[in-house]
Every structure is written in C-alpha cells, then in structure tokens.
From Swiss-Prot:
PANTHER family hit by this protein: COLLAGEN ALPHA, COLLAGEN ALPHA-2(I) CHAIN
Species: Mammut americanum
Family listed: Belongs to the fibrillar collagen family.
Protein name, entry field: Collagen alpha-2(I) chain
Compositional bias ranges of the Low complexity kind: 43-61, 154-175, 251-289, 340-356, 391-410, 434-458, 514-532, 544-560, 590-631, 640-658, 671-686, 706-716, 784-842, 872-884, 902-922, 991-1009
GO biological process, one term: extracellular matrix organization
Record: glycosylation sites: K98
Chain positions with 4-hydroxyproline modification: 176, 182, 284, 293, 410, 473, 479, 491, 497, 503, 599, 605, 704, 710, 728, 731, 761, 806, 815, 824, 902
Purpose of the protein: Type I collagen is a member of group I collagen (fibrillar forming collagen).
Chain segments carrying region Disordered: 1-228, 244-1040
Pyrrolidone carboxylic acid found at: Q1
Keyword entries, A-Z: Collagen, Extinct organism protein, Extracellular matrix, Glycoprotein, Hydroxylation, Pyrrolidone carboxylic acid, Repeat, Secreted
C-alpha cells in the first residue's frame, strides 16, 4: 500500500507496463472515464424505445390557485362628458315638440382598462412527480478488463518510481490508497439490455410556485383586441339620473311647432290684454308659428309651461347636445354590474399537468449490460501492460493503482438508440439504483457527438399552478350614464347582444324647467288648439358629431329630474361574450407552452470526467434566428439543474419570449455531486440581439358601434400581439363611445422560454481519482442549447485510470491550476438554432396564470376624435365593429417552439465559462393570447383610439424557471481543437459551473500528457447513481 503521504517528487517515470497480468478481479468499476469530449452531436438518434413507462404518478397536487392577481386598476373612468346641461326648457311657448330624447350622451371614453390584475402567481405546479424509477440500471456491462495496475513503484521520497517489481501477491488491502490515476479506461462492456424502466414514481407534489419573477416588461400591448364582445348588455342600468340633458343643443329649428300643445288653456283671448309679458323670447323654439296675433289676448296665461316642450322636441335634437356631456355617468347603469368577473375560475387546477409524459422517457438506454460486479481489484500486477481487467470482482480494496495506462482512445460515442415513442408520462419511476457503473471504457476518440442522448427525463411537469383567478378585469369604465332613459341600448354589437338593457327608466323628467320665457308672443292669436305635435322633426342626420357645442349655457336646468332610480342594475349581462377581441392577429401559434414538465430529476451528474484538455473552442455556430417568441408557457418548474453543459457563448439573445408566467419554481433537483471544475471555457461572445420584430401596424378602427350597455367586461384575454394596426377607419358616426373596456389582462408575458434544465456540468477537470461516483445519472436535459458557443477547449481527458474502488475520497488535491484555456476559439457562427423540436403536444394550456401585474396601462391612445356630436340621430344601427385591422405580422418574436422533445442531452463538455449573457433580444411577441375571457357583449367599439402608447414594458420577469430544455439546436460546427493545456493538478472538484448552453463541442484537443497518477485516494463513497448509462459498443462510448 502506498504511503500516501510520501512526498513524491513527482511521479517517476511510468514503469513499463508489464505484461497484462491476469485479469485481476476487477477493481471496483473505475469511475467512468471521462466521457470523451462529446463528439459532435450526431444526428439525434432516435430515442430508444421508450422504456416502459412507469405508471403515471398520481397527478401532482394541483397547484393551489395562484393568488388572485390584484385586480387591475380599474381603468379610469372614461371621462364622462359633462352631462349636457339640460337644455333650456323649450320656450314654453308652444311647447316645442317633445324633444326627442337626445341620445344618451356619449359614454365617456372607456376608461382605460384597468390594468389587468396581476396575474396571481401561478399556483404551484404540482410537485414533480417523483421521477419514475429509472429502470434499474442494467448490470453494468462487464467492465473491460482492468489490468491490474502494476504496483506503482513505491513512491520514493523522490517519487521516482522504482522499477516495477513483479506484482507481488496482493497483500491484504491496505487502506485504500488514493485512487490512482485513472488507468486506461477499460473497454466498455457491451451494453446490457436496457433494464425495464422502473415504474414511474409518484408524481411529486407540485413544487411551491416559484416566486414570481418580476413581471417582465409588459409585452407590447397587443393590439387592442377587438373589443371583446361586450357582455350581454346588462340590463340597462337604471338609467342614471338622466344626465342633465346635454345642453340643449341649439334647438334646431323648432320642429314645426307642433300644434302648440294646448297651451295652457289660453285664456280666451281676452281682449288683447296686455301682452303678457313677453317672456323673454325663449329662443323661439320657433315658437310655433305665432298664431296670428290674435288680439293679444293675454298671452294666455302662459299656460302652464307647456311641457317643457317636453324639452321641446329636443329641438330637433339640439345639436346633439354636445354629447350631453355624457351625463353624469348614470350610475353606470352599473354597467350591469359586471358580474364580478368570475374570478377567472380558478383555473381548475391545471389538471395536474398530467405528468408530462416523460418525454417518453428516453428509452432508457438499454440497460448497460450488466457491469460485472466490480471485482475486487485484481492483484496488482506489475504495472506492466495492464493485464486484462479481471472480471469485476466484488469491490475489493483498491489495489494500488498502477500507473495509468495510456488512455484508450475514447470509444466512439454510440448513437443513442432511437428515441422511442414518448411513453405516456409515467410517474417517474424512482431512480433505479444506479447499476454499478461498469468501468468506463476508454473514451474513444471524440466521435462526433452522437446524437445527444435523450435528455433526461423531463420530470413530470408540475401541474400548472392554477391560474390565479384573473384579477377582475379592470373595471369597465363606468358606462356613461344612460342619459335619459336611453333608448334601448343598441344591442351591443355582436356580443350576444345583451338584451337591450331595459332602458333604465327614464329618470323622471326633470321638472320642467321653468319654461324659458316665451318669446314675446305676438299677441297670441287665439292659440290654435295645439296641433298635434308635429312629429318630431326627423332627427337631423346624425351629423358628424358636431363639435361638441360648447354646452349652451345650461338654461337653468330644470331641476334635475330626480334621477331615475337607478334601474336595477342590469343584470350583469352574462358576461357577454367578450366582443370578439379584435381579431387579434394570430398570435403565433405558440401554444401555450405546455406546462413545463418539471424537469426530470436531473440524474446525479455522473462523476465529472476528467476534464480533458480543453479542445479549442470551435467557432460558435451562428446564432440561429430567434424563434418566434413562444407564448409564455407557464414557467415550468425549475428542473434541477442538470450538470453544467459546456457553457457556450451566450447565443444571440433571442427575442425575449414573452414573459411566461412565472412558473412555479420546480423543486430543486438534487444536486449532483459537484464535479470538479473543468477549465473554464472561454466565454463565447454574446450573441447579437435579435432584431425586434416590426411593430404591427394598427388595424383600422371600425366605426364605433352604438354602445350597448356595457356588459360585464369579459375577461380580456391577454392582448395578443399587437396586430398591425390598420389605418384608422374613418370615424364612424360617433356611436356612443362605449366605455372603454378594461384593458384585458395583460397576457402573461410569455414565459421566458424555459431555460432548459442546465445541462450536465461539463466534466470537471480530472479530479484526482476519486472514488467512483455511482454511475452518473442521465444528464438532465440540457437546457435549450444556447447557441453553442465554443466549448472551452476540451482537452482530452487524461486517461482515466481504472477507477480504484472508490477509496475514501482522498483529500481533494489542490485544484491544479486550470490549464490555460486556449483562447476561446473564435466564436463560430452559432450553429443554426436547431429547429425547434417537434412541438411536443402542447401541454395543457396552462391556465392563465394570474394576470401579470399590469404593465402600466399604455397611455390611452388619443381618443379618437369624438365625432362632432351630431344631433342625436336615431340610434343608428349598431355599427358593426369595423373589422379589426389586419393583424400586423407579429414581429418575429419566435415562437417558443413547443418544447421539442428535449434534444438528446449533449455530452457534457467541460463547463465553459459561462458566456456573457447575450443581450436580451427584443421582447418577443406577446405570448399567446390568454384564453379569452368570456366575451362580454361587445360594446360598440368607440372610435378606435390610437393605440395608446405602448406602456413601458414592465420589468422583465425573471426568467421563468427553467423549463425543460428546448430541443438542443444542432451543435455549431466543431471548433478546431485547442492545444492541450498542461495537465492541471487534480483540481478540487469545483462547484459545478453554471451550466452554459452546451457549447459546440470543440474538437478534441490533443490529449495532454497523463499526469502522474496520484496516489490512490481512499475509495470515495460511491456517487449517487445517476441515470446515465454508459454503453459501449466495441469500445465506442455511448453515454445516454
């Protein structure tokens, strides 16, 4: 046994390898040799047949409903136009025709929709189901014969290796020596058949919802959706007290004076008594034709004021009293009380997203053929050629590790087996016990990366947290009062027209203001009997809404009629269907990201292979175009961080996806053992920002329809991406301006595309042989592969000697200085971003998360010009909502592709330095439109205001928890191999670096010289079993 403490002056020259001793009993499986640098990704193998899917775990508990988002601020109440002053009472002279009731004043502009309530945080996703058990790792294939390491010459004080004597009999195992330098990697035994997948473990409980990240900047507000159909008009609210009648528009010419109502009984024309005082001549509502001045009888007693000319026919509808300045908003006819937006029903628990099918669990790599049981370390033969590894015996104490044999060429990475069909999401079976890792075959030369093995099972996606109830839609601005009892509200367009709200009862007519003084009536001829009131003059055309005349001075308002009682609030119309939201251009179909399955548990990272010399970083592939912004999926639970993949240079930032709702943070995956820190890869240059997508043009505003009673506002779905706003249509006749519906909830910002679970940490530099960690679990699914930057130069991992039995972990040697990382290879153009994998079936649409906090409401667009208020025409037919302008093309926010099947996990390269994060791309298009709330009846669209200025984007939300990795894009071209750095001393295992996107695999650098074997460490405890499977095929190394 070595004196581990001997001060070696350095390894003596390596003794000649003696003849291969008889196969010693296999030592415990050596730690798997470092995986050779991953070959360039081969075509993704098809995933092997999906292992049998474990039974589906029980659905995670549905996340609790997220807290209901705060209700968005109610939009400001549209400005209620001042209620037009009640026109002067018509001269009571001949009572003018009873004025036609002017149209209800225009409703004030719709208040801005309240900001959508903050979306409640998504309920916690159901806990990740326990990952189904990874099928038991098949018995490790036999470990290639590990030659018995020749005894290392005794480490002389000068460390010179004495001649290797013949291997004496193995003495009783001394304390485990430090693991010797890894011997050549034995050949990987044949891959055993894949063991059956264990049953999926029960689905874990949904992790608590991650904290919502700050709300991302609100995406650009989507074009205003067409106003949702206004909910059915609630029953008209009680007509608010009749707003003061708008200033009586200038009385149009008095309609032909109807026959003057019987003016109070005109006294018989007495002798033309003194002409009654000529009242001031009211504006002659053309006081009906003065009767021929009869003898000016007394101006008959001014009969009771004729009805206030029933407000005269409102003279011809006076100029539409400037829109009676929208009478005080009648109590919004309580906008039918918007039934409280039903809280967005808690989105039913997103059914627990059934466990996402394990992305069909990548068919488990066939179970590595049984790794033979680790034999006890064979007798240490002379460190002659390594004798064939004896059959693995039971782990004996590691015999002294002989000098590391040359590292065999890394076997080619086998192709991943075909991806099997995704099994139904089973419960993740419990992690099977890691089979004994068979000796890792020597890494073959870097093959091209085989197709990345299937990503680790994506954990069952936690159930999407229930969408918190949507905050109630901002209150719809109060409907302007129904002016005097409005004519029956025109049916809101297209909503289901609520039934016309019952016209609120007209408020009692204000008492007739004292009739304006009658103009001096010429001597009133005998007042002819009041002819039948002429029909109210036809409503003048609804002029362009005249400029709202300044409200005439209000004649003394007749006492305001008592406000009609507020009609019962109309029953809130059922939430009318939300008027169609203008056609929101199609949002790119990003289906809502299916709930992110919880990233499957990342298998424990396999032991970090020795970090080979860093190959030169290959040029980073060019950044692929940012895919269209996916709709914000819910933020999937953060999967456990997989081992760090190579940090590629930061890819060009794609356009930022819409901020997804913050998914609940998935449970933190178990930390894999920290692999030794690999050399820091050069940071790749940040990718360029993707160009912002063009703003869509604004669609034409349709002519405003008549305002129906505002139904309860349906939930506005999140605004779709702004369509191109078409040029505003000519203002329609000003319908009453419907109240501005509340701004729909701001759709959740699409979730930042889930960052895939971090890829497995790159191989840390070779740790002095450490005890053999258990087999590495399958690397977590790599995060979406960033544009692969060049991986740090991956040196060939020095040959890893056979892993001694895991001795007790020897003290970690000082980390050797990192080899000088070769300069990062020029960043190759980022490899094309892989096409998004086939979209997996969209996960259940996550329920809308709680509405994100409202971004500040965009400033209201300038209100469309109010048309001049025309005389109130008869309510014109409800204008059809103008067709929404064509939705402009979404800017290229790429959609998040549906989460492709996670690409096969790339081999873990050394952890490159995390490249700087590329600047965030422009905010991607807003995620998919949330489910439209119930359409309220569609209010007639008011003039379409210009789109308000886009609200400032809210803070960008934190990245959603890492979602399952997107498909790994094709690896960028492999950079040239960098020079091998000097072999560093065994570093202490560094913390796993942040997982960068897997970089393009650099070419394998030359293998650095093997460092001298370190003294064998005490056997380390077996590492956690990972789910990785090493398969060798004839030495080719395939790591699933």
């Amino acid at each position: 046994q070595y004196d581990a403490k001997g001060v070696g002056l350095g390894p003596g020259p390596m003794g000649l390898m003696g003849p291969r001793g008889p196969p010693g009993a296999t030592g415990p499986p050596g730690s798997p040799g470092f995986q050779g640098p991953p070959g360039e990704p081969g075509e993704p193998g098809q995933t092997g047949p999906a292992g049998s899917r474990g039974p589906a775990g029980p659905p995670g508990k549905a996340g609790e409903d997220g807290h209901p988002g705060k209700p968005g601020r109610p939009g400001e109440r549209g400005v209620v136009g001042p209620q037009g002053a009640r026109g002067f009472p018509g001269t009571p002279g001949l009572p003018g025709f009873k004025g036609i009731r002017g149209h209800n004043g225009l409703d004030g502009l719709k208040g801005q929709p309240g900001a959508p309530g903050v979306k409640g945080e998504p309920g916690a996703p159901g806990e990740n189901g326990t990952p189904g058990q990874i099928g038991a790792r098949g018995l490790p294939g036999e470990r290639g014969r590990v030659g018995g390491p020749g005894p290392a010459g005794a480490r002389g004080s000068d460390g010179s290796v004495g001649p290797v004597g013949p291997a004496g009999p193995i003495g009783s195992a001394g304390p485990p020596g430090f693991p010797g330098a890894p011997g050549p990697k034995g050949e990987i035994g044949p891959v055993g058949n894949p063991g059956p997948s264990g049953p999926a473990g029960p689905r874990g409980e949904a992790g608590l919802p991650g904290v919502s990240g700050p709300v991302g900047p609100p995406g650009n507000p989507g074009a205003n959706g067409l106003a949702g159909a206004k909910g059915a008009a609630g029953l008209p609210g009680v007509a608010g007290a009749p707003g003061l009648p708008g200033p009586r528009g200038i009385p149009g010419p008095v309609g032909a004076a109807g026959a003057t109502g019987a003016r109070g009984i005109v006294g018989e024309p007495g002798p033309a008594g003194s002409k009654g005082e000529s009242g001031s001549k009211g504006e002659p509502g053309s006081a009906g034709p003065q009767g021929p001045p009869g003898p000016s009888g007394e101006e008959g007693k001014r009969g009771p004021n004729g009805e206030a000319g029933s407000a005269g026919p409102a003279g011809p509808p006076g100029l539409r009293g400037g829109p009676g300045s929208r009478g005080l908003p009648g109590a919004d006819g309580r906008a039918g009380v918007m039934g409280p937006p039903g809280s967005r029903g808690a989105s039913g628990p997103a059914g627990v997203r059934g466990p996402s099918g394990d992305s069909g669990r990548p068919g488990e790599p066939g179970v590595m053929g049984p790794r033979g049981l680790p034999g006890s370390p064979g007798n240490v033969g002379p460190a002659g050629k390594e004798g064939p590894a004896g059959l693995p015996g039971i782990d004996g104490r590691p015999g002294p590790i002989g000098p590391a044999g040359a590292r065999g060429e890394p076997g080619n990475i086998g192709f991943p087996g075909p991806k099997g069909p995704a099994g139904d999401p089973g419960k993740n079976g419990d992690k099977g016990h890691a089979g004994l890792a068979g000796p890792r075959g020597a890494p073959g030369p870097d093959g091209n990366n085989g197709a990345q093995g299937p990503p680790g099972l994506q954990g069952v996606q936690g159930g999407k947290g229930e969408q918190g109830p949507a905050g109630p839609p901002g209150f719809q601005g109060l409907p302007g009062p129904s002016g005097t009892a409005g004519e029956a509200g025109k049916p809101g367009e297209r909503g289901i027209p609520g039934e016309f709200g019952l016209p609120g009862p007209a408020g009692p007519r204000g008492e007739r203001g004292p009739p304006g003084q009658s103009g001096a009536a010429g001597p009133t001829g005998p007042i002819g009997s009041r002819g039948p009131s002429g029909p109210p003059g036809p409503d003048g055309n609804k002029g362009e809404p005249g400029v709202v005349g300044a409200p005439g001075t209000a004649g003394p308002s007749g006492p305001v009629g008592l406000p009609g009682e507020r009609g019962a609030a109309g029953i809130p119309g059922g939430k009318g269907e939300k008027g169609e939201t203008g056609l929101r251009g199609d949002t790119g179909n990003t289906g809502r990201d299916g709930a992110r399955g919880a990233p499957g548990a990342v298998g424990a990272p396999g032991p970090a292979g020795a970090t080979g010399d860093r190959g030169e970083a290959g040029p980073a592939g060019s950044a692929g175009p940012a895919g269209p912004r996916g709709s914000p999926g819910e933020r999937g639970e953060v999967g456990p961080a997989g081992p760090n993949g190579f940090a590629g240079p930061a890819g060009a930032a794609g356009q930022a996806g819409a901020k997804g709702e913050r998914g609940t943070k998935g449970p933190k995956g178990e930390n894999g053992p920290v692999g030794p820190t690999g050399p820091v890869g050069a940071a790749g240059p940040a990718g360029p920002n993707g160009p912002p997508g063009p703003a869509g043009s604004r669609g034409d505003g349709g002519p405003p329809g008549a305002t129906g009673f505002p139904g309860a506002a349906g939930r506005t779905g999140p605004p779709g991406p702004a369509g191109i706003t078409g040029p505003p249509g000519p203002p329609g006749a000003a319908g009453k301006e419907g109240l501005r519906g509340p701004r729909g909830d701001q759709g959740p910002v699409g979730r930042t595309g889930e960052t895939g679970a971090s890829g497995p940490p790159g191989f840390a530099g070779e740790k002095g042989s450490s005890g053999e960690p258990g087999t590495a679990g399958p690397p977590g699914a790599p995060g979406p592969q960033g544009i692969l930057g060049p991986p740090g130069i991956l040196g060939l991992p020095g040959s890893r000697g056979e892993r001694g039995l895991p001795g007790v972990a020897g003290a970690v040697g000082e980390p050797g200085p990192l080899g000088i990382a070769g300069p990062p290879g020029a960043r190759g153009p980022p490899g094309a971003v892989g096409s998004p994998g086939v979209n997996g079936a969209p996960g259940e649409a996550g329920r809308d998360g709680n509405p994100g906090s409202d971004g500040p409401p965009g400033r209201d667009g300038l209100p469309g010009h109010k048309g001049e208020r025309g005389y109130p025409g008869n309510a014109g037919p409800v204008g059809t909502a103008g067709a929404p302008g064509p939705q402009g093309p979404l800017g290229p926010a790429g959609k998040h592709g549906n989460r492709g099947e996670p690409g096969p996990a790339g081999s873990v390269g050394p952890v490159g330095a995390v490249g700087p994060r590329g600047p965030s791309g422009p905010q991607g298009a807003r995620g998919d439109k949330g489910e439209a709330g119930d359409k309220g009846p569609r209010g007639l669209p008011g003039f379409k205001g210009h789109n308000g200025l886009q609200g400032l984007p809210g803070l960008a939300g934190q990245h959603g928890d890492q979602g399952s990795p997107g498909s790994v894009g094709p690896a960028g071209p492999r950079g040239p191999a960098g020079p091998s750095g000097p072999v560093g001393k065994d570093g202490r295992p560094g913390h796993a670096g942040a997982v960068g996107p897997a970089g393009v695999r650099g070419s394998q650098g030359s293998q650095g010289p093997s460092g001298p074997p370190g003294p064998p460490g005490p056997p380390g405890p077996p590492g956690p079993s990972g789910g990785g499977y090493d398969f060798g095929y004839d030495g080719d190394f395939y790591r699933a």
